[in-house]
């Protein structure tokens, strides 16, 4: 049986998500799609939290990191989280075609 993790969101993740939501809703004029993306993101994070988040493949980075970054892919976006003791800390929400090495 795996340990239970608490969930924590960094302000940077919340900022990333808000910027994407605003872009889809206001620039692309598709608030329904923006809301669906938020819902899909919430569901994917909660699902990962309940399915032993350490059991998934980490993101391979050239940088030395104190904590491994794990990706969750949601449509054209990727959520990155780390595990710190009993906390799943959600750190970034980025467009999947961006250069992750410059963002995390």
Name the predicted role of every residue range.
Residues 70-104:
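Enriched for short, Lys/Arg-rich terminal
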């Amino acid at each position: 049986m795996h340990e239970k993790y608490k969930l924590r969101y960094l302000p940077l993740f919340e900022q990333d998500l808000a910027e994407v939501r605003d872009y889809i809703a206001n620039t692309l004029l598709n608030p329904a799609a923006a809301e669906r993306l938020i819902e899909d993101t919430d569901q994917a994070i909660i699902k990962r939290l309940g399915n032993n988040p350490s059991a998934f493949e980490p993101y391979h980075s050239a940088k030395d990191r104190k904590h491994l970054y794990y990706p969750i892919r949601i449509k054209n976006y990727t959520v990155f989280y780390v595990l710190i003791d009993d906390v799943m800390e959600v750190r970034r929400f980025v467009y999947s075609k961006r250069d992750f090495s410059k963002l995390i």
